[in-house]
């Protein structure tokens, strides 16, 4: 399966039990910042934004004082899983980032999608990729 198919079929799909509800943007990005696949709506990010995200995975809490920035949008960092998942909130939406062995899986959402549903979609694919050694 291509990386784009993972984004299209597993991240940007209707959320289980909620027909028509889906993430607003998603991507799979290598830990070096190279985009493997992304939705058309995924924001163009700056290298320093990706560096900040990678630093937070290696030094949990790094982004808490400044917030998580992606494509110029600032998210307030909320409880995640140290070294594995970063979660952010902005207004009625937010972001979930799951780290795998080689990549980062991004999901961005707005209401009516809930933080929990975004976490489920992103982390399920991230866990699958981890199981595959990716």
Curated annotation (Swiss-Prot):
Post-translational modification Phosphothreonine, affected residues: 114
Main subcellular localisation: cytoplasm
GO CC terms of this entry: cell cortex; cytoskeleton
Residue pairs linked by disulfide bridges in the UniProt entry: 13-118
Gene3D superfamilies hit by this protein: Dynein light chain 2a, cytoplasmic
Keywords, alphabetical: Actin-binding, Allergen, Cytoplasm, Cytoskeleton, Disulfide bond, Phosphoprotein
PANTHER family on file: PROFILIN, PROFILIN-5
Function: Binds to actin and affects the structure of the cytoskeleton. At high concentrations, profilin prevents the polymerization of actin, whereas it enhances it at low concentrations.
Protein name: Profilin-4
Organism of this sequence: Olea europaea
